Regions:
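Mixed-charge (Asp/Glu-Lys/Arg
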Residues: 1-105
């Protein structure tokens, strides 16, 4: 899993890939600096809307994690950014992804 490998290269630990069905939008569970993360990975050809934000927010609670993140190779719609701000969901867009990839080399 590319996202899981990328997290490992960026000093995340206890990385666990969830099952595909029934995961409530959570693809990966991870930890960094004693903070636990529920992460949804989206590899899309268009910007990410607020459905992903709502899913990961729900999934964070289900898995009892500290932080909810949506990681994507794209950007987020204005509505998604507003939703994420209201629900305290971290948005890691293609710029953040690029920074994470640069940490590998």
């Amino acid at each position: 899993n590319y996202c899981a490998d990328l997290l490992q290269y960026n000093n995340f630990s206890n990385i666990e890939i969830t099952q595909a069905s029934g995961d409530h939008g959570v693809d990966i569970l991870a930890e960094k600096d004693s903070i636990t993360y529920a992460i949804q990975c989206k590899c899309y050809s268009s910007n990410i809307g607020n459905a992903a934000i709502q899913q990961i927010h729900s999934g964070k609670s289900l898995y009892h994690k500290d932080v909810a993140v949506v990681l994507t190779n794209q950007y987020f719609t204005t509505q998604a950014r507003k939703e994420a701000n209201a629900l305290n969901v971290k948005l890691w867009d293609r710029d953040k992804l690029y920074e994470m990839i640069k940490n590998i080399t």
